[in-house]
Every structure is written in structure tokens, then in C-alpha cells.
Swiss-Prot record:
The gene is abh1. The keyword Oxidoreductase applies. This is tRNA demethylase abh1. Binds 1 Fe(2+) ion per subunit. Belongs to the alkB family. It holds the Pfam family 2OG-FeII_Oxy_2. Disruption phenotype: No sensitivity to methyl methanesulfonate (MMS). It is found in: Cytoplasm; Nucleus. Its EC number is 1.14.11.-. It comes from the Eukaryota. It catalyses: an N(1)-methyladenosine in tRNA + 2-oxoglutarate + O2 = an adenosine in tRNA + formaldehyde + succinate + CO2; N(1)-methyladenosine(58) in tRNA + 2-oxoglutarate + O2 = adenosine(58) in tRNA + formaldehyde + succinate + CO2. GO terms for cellular component: cytoplasm; cytosol; nucleus. It comes from Schizosaccharomyces pombe (strain 972 / ATCC 24843).
Amino acid sequence: MLAGNMEQANVFRLEEKRYKCRADTIPDMSEVLDPNDPQSFGFEALVEIKPRVFSFQKAPGLLILKNYVSSELQMQLLKSIMFTQIQDPENKTNLSPFYQLPLGNDSIWRRYYNGDGESIIDGLGETKPLTVDRLVHKKLRWVTLGEQYDWTTKEYPDPSKSPGFPKDLGDFVEKVVKESTDFLHWKAEAAIVNFYSPGDTLSAHIDESEEDLTLPLISLSMGLDCIYLIGTESRSEKPSALRLHSGDVVIMTGTSRKAFHAVPKIIPNSTPNYLLTGNKAWDGWISRKRVNFNVRQVRPSR
């Protein structure tokens, strides 16, 4: 009886388990809304409020912008993050505390891209050394841009000590927010860029470290498709499942801004051909990655 009550109290977790499966397989998609497929489950819940901007009636405040990031801009932003941002020592990555990372033109990405994937990167302390290939494909999970979120304190430090926010990403996201919402003075101040491979997941959570939770969160999807779950402020209510594609934008405003959300499944073999260049290293990476840019304004405008 106790187990049954616990399951009832965490319906969200049951839905996460429903869609999580072996990395190389695809789960039952019969109850997944695909914004790009009018025949998909629950498509009628999407309402176009502006050109290519859709509200989702089951998650008040959630906006879905289909194919909003052009293929050219996707490539530009992906190259910027890999060739410029991760080699900047001011931008933290999940690897930074554990490895003696080479930076600048000798970064792990540039070594990988230039065919030196078998070179060894030494660990710090008791961390074992690993090859560049393994670090790039398996171990690199995130990088922070702009104001550097402190994962230990769950806070943003003094903004005066943070690196500047990347202009290309900031300009685009601010334009998207102004075109799609009433937040005309919203500023891109911080971002977490997540790198997912098939088999990776993001558990249910609410983003609540920012000072003003009425300000929207913006998510850009690139690379592999994913299943995205969006619920309410309670884990006891069943979330909706959506399939997000490369180039889609999700904006969380209103009630959805404080809703539990998760990514239980990365869909293999779904990277669009326009992100492939013919370069073996690049194609081998992007064909097995979902890159998610999650951008936010940290504190109210003053």
C-alpha cells in the first residue's frame, strides 16, 4: 500500500521511466506530441499565437517555436560553443575540477577535431587520465556562459566577476523573447549548455535559482531529437510528452516557468543532415549529440 501511495505521489517519475529505454531504441511514441507532425498525439492543444509561435494549452505559459533557429545559425552557434567558448578558462565545464584541461588552440575539442583524439589528458588528484576522444564523446556534459552558476551553493556569484555573455547567442535569444513574449527588456545573462548522448537523461526539476521566477527561460535544441516532459508544480500530476527537434525553441513563462520538466530520452539517429559537414570528427560528434542552450536572465532589470 505504501509503495502504491508513493507511485501515486510521483506520477512524473513513472512517465520518466516509461520513455527511458535502451540508448539505441525508440520508446512507444503514441502519446508524444510532435509539434512538426499535425497527425501526432494531442496536436490540437497547440495554438498558433504568432507566426511559428505556439502556446500549449496543457502547460499554460509554455511557448513552442517550431524550426525557429535557421540551419545556418545552428551551425554558427554550435561552432562557437565548441571552437571558442569551451576553450575559454572563464567558462566552467563539468570537467574543470577533475582534469588538467589544455585551453586556447590546444583545447580538447581542437585536439579531437584535428585528429588527435588518442592523446591523453591527465586527471587532477585521484581522477584517472582519459583520452581526448572519451572526454569529448562521453564526459563533457555542460559548460556555463555569462554569469557562472555555482553548482555547490546553487547561486549566481557577483556578476561583475563573470565573463561577458556571447554576443551571437545573446542577440538571437533576446530577439526571440521580444518577438514572442511581452518581456521586451529581457536580457540574456547566463546560460547552461548541456551535451546529451543517446542513453543520457535529465531528471525532473524546477529551475529556481534566479531572483525573479516570472522571467522566462529559453531553451534552444540542436542535434538529436529528444522527448521533453512538462508537468506542473507537483510531481503527482501526469506530465505531457513532446518531441523536440533541432532548431526548435521552448520558452517557459507563466505557470510553466515553475513547472517540473525533464528529458527522459534522446532519440538516436535523428540529427538533421544539414548539420553534417563531411568532416569525420564533426559528423561523428554531432550525429551522436543533442546540444541544448538553456538561457536565462538572472536578476530583475534595474
